[in-house]
Amino acid sequence: MYQFQQDNQYFIFNFDRTFDQATEFFQAEFWQKQERVIGSAKGRGTTYFLQTEDWFGVNCALRHYYRGGLWGKLNKDRYRFSDLETTRSFAEFHLLQRLYEAGFPVPKPIAARIQKGKLGICYQADILTEKIENAQDLTALLQTQTLPKETWTQIGRLIRKLHDLQICHTDLNAHNILLQQIEQEQKCWLLDFDKCGEKSGDFWKVQNLNRLKRSFEKEIRRMNIQFTEQNWADLTAAYHQ
C-alpha cells in the first residue's frame, strides 16, 4: 500500500509503488482518450467501468463523490476537511480493505484520491474499486425474473455476517447488492460503503434491515420488480439463524 501527496492532492494506492499518471487515473477524460471505458452506470453521478486488468490486475470502477438531498443542490461535491483518514474516499478505501482482507465479498479497493481547494478547508474525492464481473444488481435482475429461496437465504446470511462484524451499511438497498453468476452458481456482493463504518450495539441493525425492505417496496412501485413478502421472509429467516 502506498500513500503520497502531490501538491494539493493526496493519494492512496493498493500497491507498493506510485504511478506517473496518478492524477489522470481519477479523470474520466483520461480513460476515454485511452479507449478504456467499457461501460457506465448512473447514480448521483456517473460511475465509469474501466478496462484496467493489464495495469491493476482487475478491471475497475471509477466514482466521484457527490452530495445528495437539498444540500447537494447547493454544494454538489465539496466536503469540509478535518483529517485525511476521515475523508470520504480514504475512509471507504480503508473499510473496503478491512472487509476484503477478512474475506467479505466486497470489491477490492484499488486507489483513492482527495483534492483540497485553494484554502485547504474543503476537498473533493474519488475512488477506484474493483469491477465485479458478470454481475447485476438486484433491481436489474428482479425486473425480469424471480429469485429462488436459496438466493434470498444467501443475502440474509451475508447481511448478518456484516452486522456480526458491527459494520453498519448506511445505504443498504437493493441497488447495492450484486449477484454474480459463476458457472452454475451465484455469489452475492455488497457495494458502496461511503459513510459506512463500525457501530456499537444492536439497535441500528433492525433499522438497517427496514431500510433494505423499504428499498424493495420502492422499486416495486417504480420498476415493478418481482419481490414478495415470502422473499423477505426467506431473507430474514436466514438472517436470524
Curated annotation (Swiss-Prot):
InterPro entries in the record: KDO_kinase, Kinase-like_dom_sf
Residues making up the signal peptide according to the UniProt record: none
Primary site of residence: membrane
One BP annotation, GO: lipopolysaccharide core region biosynthetic process
EC number: 2.7.1.166
HAMAP family linked to this entry: KDO_kinase (MF_00521)
Identification of the protein by name: 3-deoxy-D-manno-octulosonic acid kinase
Organism (species): Haemophilus influenzae (strain PittGG)
